[in-house]
A protein has these predicted regions:
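An acidic- and aromatic-residue-enriched active-site/binding cleft used to recognize and process polar
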Residues: 219-223, 231, 247, 279, ...
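Conserved catalytic alpha/beta cores of large enzymes that bind or transform nucleotide phosphates
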Residues: 241-328
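Short acidic-glycine loop/turn motifs at beta-strand connectors
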Residues: 47, 211-212, 277-283, 355
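Append "with occasional cross-activation on large, charged helical scaffolds in nucleic-acid assemblies
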Residues: 288-291, 301-478, 489
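Secondary-structure transition/capping motifs at alpha-helix termini
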Residues: 225, 234-235, 279-282, 347-355, ...
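Short beta-strand elements
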Residues: 83-87, 206-210, 275-278, 288-290, ...
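Charge-lined substrate channels and their catalytic hotspots, especially those that engage the 3′ end
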Residues: 1-219, 223-267
Length: 489
């Protein structure tokens, strides 16, 4: 069989390949035979005809519906051109009924459509969903989610979680505390626990306390709730919370992310705790345990109330005097949290590496021959920009290796575990870490959930890359402007 590959929607640049993947010349016009990109077929040399055509499945296509001109009718609806986001697909005709508003303005639409048939010049499509107007920022982001294959339903998980949460009472909390071996840290006189986050934050997944020479870092134990409520099998395929200028698309239903799992003030919550013992300005011991905590305050970064808090001041002074802070200069509360999260990720990675399990973070600088001595003398803001600009590859892997990043160079291993409310990898590492450290052995459903995602590590990396692209504001602005230019009157 032969394969047809096209690079533009006008079919001006296309190629044919044989079954050995060798490029060949065939005397056929792909438009005459209505071939889509990546179609396979047999070629009859004598009759100059193609047979056994195997077209790719085209059942959910994002595109822009152009409403300034009609092209006939199909089943009592006018046909309009629809330009697919995928530039390898030709322009379709899609039936649509225009509804004029008060101002009589016809605005092009972001849509999802499917392929029906291709009998004439343009293939015919069928509308699946009208996402919204091209000059609407929310519609644009929904359109991008569809194209980047990041639109996953959490309806089943949301409904089930809501039913479970409604039944939570004091007995439930005590049952979880006992079952998951959680030490009681809810006495604020002994453990003044607080969070530091942006002002609009609701999904608090990390907290901290300090008591003399011991710093405790607490991470929301999302795995405990999912395990207790038996939610593993209905988890969605979302790999991360997505932060957009106009909204947040949570990895978990908000009843979990912003409420039950979130380390909210004055609420009993479950967290895995890392204890750092400080002596002579060095970390001399690190230990982990499951805890039940009650946060005393949800602070905002650098607010006056935080700066005046004696516990925060003690924490800040202790960290600024530490001898090793992974090249992080601790100047404010942002640096405090950054250092503590890096520290926990690092020490957890050492344990996971020793036990030969876990999902590790691998980040490489594009220029491996970069002269670090010269870079080190640059002003901090320029150095940050330079290294962030050069940093182009970041993946998750099952193999621990050198971790090269903006603030902490060449750690022998590194994992993400401190944001389990927001990232699937952190949740997966949280499961394995507790198992490997004999903190708690989760259910078979939890282990199956972990194994399923380990086998889909490529998908995690691809989706995370797509999410990073989607969150780049510069790209949003230019794309939205180009689509808004298509507004018709």
């Amino acid at each position: 069989m032969y394969e047809f590959v096209v690079n533009d929607r006008n079919y001006l640049n296309y190629r044919f390949f044989d079954n050995l993947n060798n490029e060949i010349m065939l005397p056929i016009n792909p438009l005459n035979f209505k071939l889509f990109n990546n179609s396979f077929f047999d070629y009859d040399l004598i009759n100059e005809n193609i047979t056994n055509v195997q077209q790719p499945v085209i059942n959910d296509i994002p595109g822009v519906l152009i409403l300034n001109k009609t092209f006939g009718k199909y089943k009592n609806k006018f046909l309009y051109k629809c330009v697919p986001y995928d530039t390898s697909l030709p322009i379709f005709l899609v039936p649509y009924k225009v509804v004029l508003g008060f101002n009589k303005e016809t605005v092009n639409k972001y849509v999802r459509f499917s392929f029906l048939h291709w009998d004439d010049k343009h293939p015919i499509g069928e509308l699946i969903e009208c996402i919204g107007d091209v000059n609407n920022i929310s519609s644009y982001y929904q359109y991008e989610l569809v194209f980047r294959k990041l639109k996953y339903s959490i309806k089943s998980l949301q409904n089930n979680a809501f039913k479970q949460v409604k039944q939570i009472n004091d007995a439930t909390i005590e049952d979880i505390k006992t079952k998951y071996n959680c030490e009681d840290y809810t006495n604020s006189n002994k453990n003044y626990i607080f969070t530091i986050d942006p002002s609009d934050c609701k999904d608090f997944d990390d907290a901290v306390s300090i008591n003399n020479n011991i710093i405790n870092v607490y991470i929301a134990n999302v795995a405990v709730w999912l395990d207790y409520f038996k939610l593993w099998e209905i988890m969605s395929d979302r790999v991360s919370t997505i932060y957009l200028p106009d909204s947040k698309i949570s990895m978990l239903p908000t009843i979990l992310s912003d409420d039950i799992c979130s380390l909210r003030k004055n609420k009993k919550r479950f967290a895995i705790c890392m204890s750092l013992v400080i002596k002579n300005n060095e970390i001399v011991d690190v230990s982990f345990k499951n805890t039940m905590i009650k946060v005393a305050n949800n602070f905002v970064y650098d607010e006056d109330k935080l700066k005046k808090n004696k516990n925060y001041r003690e924490l800040f002074n202790t960290l600024t005097n530490l001898k090793n802070t992974f090249n992080i200069k601790i100047k404010d509360s942002h640096d405090v949290i950054m250092y503590l999260m890096i520290t926990m990720n690092y020490y957890c990675s050492l344990r996971l590496k020793k036990n030969k399990i876990g999902i590790f973070r691998e980040v490489k600088i594009k220029d491996n021959d970069m002269n670090r001595d010269k870079i080190s003398i640059l002003p901090e803001n320029i150095k940050t920009f330079y290294r962030l600009y050069r940093n182009v590859t970041a993946n998750y892997t099952l193999e621990p290796g050198n971790y090269d990043s903006l603030h902490h160079d060449f750690l022998e291993s590194y994992v993400h575990i401190t944001s389990p409310i927001r990232r699937i990898v952190d949740l997966l590492n949280l499961i394995q870490f507790q198992t490997s450290e004999n903190i708690y052995h989760f259910s078979n459903q939890a282990i199956s959930f972990y194994d399923k995602w380990v086998n889909k590590l490529l998908k995690i990396n691809l989706d995370m890359k797509s999410i990073r692209k989607l969150q780049r504001s510069e790209e949003h602005t230019s794309e939205l402007q180009s689509h808004s230019d298509l507004v018709c009157r």
